[in-house]
């Protein structure tokens, strides 16, 4: 053991020196500088969108920083590829594992550096080496087993063994327990302690407070892509102080909130169950109300929206719209009922990238007068696209411009324009301002408030605490597939919302 400690400790500390990363219209990281010591588990904490995953992608070579360098020991780096990161002794174990299900465990472990003899893969040596790597880590896993036949927890152990096969000095874990059982979590914690005790640098990203206090030696907090503080000693820290550090910032006056009168019941959900919901979900939203849903990654909010929009089928529960029973078997049922969804991943699910702005606005939209003929239909579509571009303030050179060349904010406004072309009663907005600059955010907030003033029930999923507090009349909090709290606008504060959203136990 002492030899292993000395082997990895000589790799030195991991230092981030002035790391900056800018995407079009968004500053993801700004001047990030801190140090993680060998022989320690260093947590990265912050809300969704704080910049943790972006930093890990830079560490792993998937992204290249616009400024700054990494330093491991005395050597400075700016990785231009994942191969360069691996060669420097870095392994990043992502939430979605980078393994090949159809290959055997041994093939996955040694992919890229398989033993060979006379130019052919030496399979005997490959399986022996794989067995050595799994020994003491996952003795029950047969190297000959097809990886797709393993549990998620076992696949994660294979990913860790793969990192060890490359003698990684720096190992980063990104939300590693999000889909693990309590027993698998216990096992993972023990392995992380073992890796730490060998002198490696361990970075650990998790929203689970109990894991942070259980296994970590230091914590660095991020907020809006900026470094906030590093706590070098866990003894200096408790749950409330960490939450306060994560959420502390001034509210910017960009939300355009104004009080409004609600106009009677709109959508009522009773005892709803389905994929991603682990307890029956019950709530109601009023006409003219903006109802916010807050939660962390994996809370079940997007899964709830998929049920409400007919993308997935419920296994239990009932829906009522305007006091009448509603059954959703498909997205068409939801659209015809007036329940419209702006999805979280607009590039994959919200737009057709190669089509024009006008074509994207008119997807599914039809004039209220039927049987008008092709010429009149075409004229209506042109007029409708121009009208929505103007009313939504979509910045585009032309309605015929391919939508892929617009900014994220203008793409989102075009999607909203599409739905305004149709009869609407309930609007579902899943992370409506993710990846959008502040100016476009303010415009989208204004659109939301105008829709509510017109009597539309607007339900907004957001991982941004300030946003959900700034635009909502009422806030529901979800955690691990269940509603864990409800707060009126004047009751909500960041600490209460985050405490309701943070999972504390796992059965």
From Swiss-Prot:
UniProt-listed SUPFAM superfamilies: P-loop containing nucleoside triphosphate hydrolases
InterPro entries assigned: AAA+_ATPase, ABC_carbohydrate_import_ATPase, ABC_transporter-like_ATP-bd, ABC_transporter-like_CS, P-loop_NTPase
Record's catalysed reaction(s): L-arabinose(out) + ATP + H2O = L-arabinose(in) + ADP + phosphate + H(+)
Places the protein is found: Cell inner membrane
Keywords: ATP-binding, Cell inner membrane, Cell membrane, Membrane, Nucleotide-binding, Repeat, Sugar transport, Translocase, Transport
Gene Ontology molecular function: ABC-type L-arabinose transporter activity; ATP binding; ATP hydrolysis activity
Annotated Gene Ontology cellular component terms: plasma membrane
Protein EC: 7.5.2.12
Segments passing through the bilayer: none
Binding site residues for ATP: 46-53
Membrane-topology annotation of the record: Peripheral membrane protein
Family to which the UniProt record says this protein belongs: Belongs to the ABC transporter superfamily. Arabinose importer (TC 3.A.1.2.2) family.
Subunit composition and interactions: The complex is composed of two ATP-binding proteins (AraG), two transmembrane proteins (AraH) and a solute-binding protein (AraF).
Task of the protein: Part of the ABC transporter complex AraFGH involved in arabinose import. Responsible for energy coupling to the transport system.
The protein, known as: Arabinose import ATP-binding protein AraG
Gene: araG
